[in-house]
Amino acid sequence: ALRPEEREMVERNLGFFSTADSLVANNLVLAVYKHITNPECRQYLLRQAFEEAIHTHAYQYCVQSLGLDEARIFNMYRELPAVATKAEWALPFTQSLGDPTFKTGTHKDNQRLLRDLIAFYVVFEGIFFYVGFTQILSLGRRNKLTGVSQQFQYILRDESMHMNFGIDVINQLKNENPTLWTEEFQQEMINLIT
């Protein structure tokens, strides 16, 4: 049986992830896809969006399997400050790429694309996701919620590939446009990540 604080941790993680993967899928389809023009990368982005939909379903399955209050869990991004803060942090970075007037081609806009990709892949899909994964997987290592932990293992496998892909795209943009990676911009990215 879970201790009350473990149950709270599971609920908060499911509340965050059920919303976060929807944000990720929307960002991929509505924003990132139109700015990444390499055909192979675009194919991968579509695959990633498909996997995010599967993850969202897996979180819903976990919530239902555990008999948790679905409305409460799925509304945590609105009602629980710890979950809402993460979603609110990510929104400006995802919305700017989805802005129909945004176009790359200038130094400033190319840096904006690079900044938003770093925020999206390194911070949101990297740091924020991995914190939740480690918490749930730690329960599985103690033979608690082994089925949920197994679902998170599968999702972690996918998310590791997503993050690595994103970092590859970021590095390729930096290599193709070395003038974007100024000392000032580097410091901005360090501040973003920390």
Task: Identify the role of each PLM range.
Residues 1-194:
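Non-heme di-metal
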